[in-house]
Amino acid sequence: MAHKKGTGSTRNGRDSNSKRLGVKAYGGETVTAGSILIRQRGTSVLPGVNVGQGKDDTLFALTDGVVTFESIRRSLRNRKRISVVASS
């Protein structure tokens, strides 16, 4: 006879690392060229003027300036666009 009780298996016990997604520079903030503005999966926020888009859909500033957000109307859903107004 066994002197130890057999332990059952479990299907839990896994968790992924957080990806730190979200807005990194809010409206009205001053940013420098190359600054990350938004980390996202997919294009929930579209790039506007002076904003580039990386291969992982990260939005970043192309010039120094001030961050602005605007809502744009698309056929099926409203979207947001982020732009950088160049500092003069």
Curated annotation (Swiss-Prot):
Keyword Iron-sulfur appears in the UniProt entry: no
SUPFAM superfamilies given in the database record: Ribosomal L27 protein-like
Single annotated GO MF: structural constituent of ribosome
InterPro entries on file: Ribosomal_bL27, Ribosomal_bL27_CS
Gene Ontology annotations for the cellular component aspect, listed alphabetically: cytosolic large ribosomal subunit
GO biological process, one term: translation
Gene3D superfamilies registered for this protein in UniProt: 2.40.50.100
Ribosomal protein in keyword set: yes
Superkingdom of origin organism: Bacteria
Residue numbers spanned by region Disordered: 1-24
UniProt keywords, alphabetically: Ribonucleoprotein, Ribosomal protein
Family from the record: Belongs to the bacterial ribosomal protein bL27 family.
UniProt-listed HAMAP family: Ribosomal_bL27
Protein name per UniProt: Large ribosomal subunit protein bL27
Organism, scientific name: Prochlorococcus marinus (strain MIT 9303)
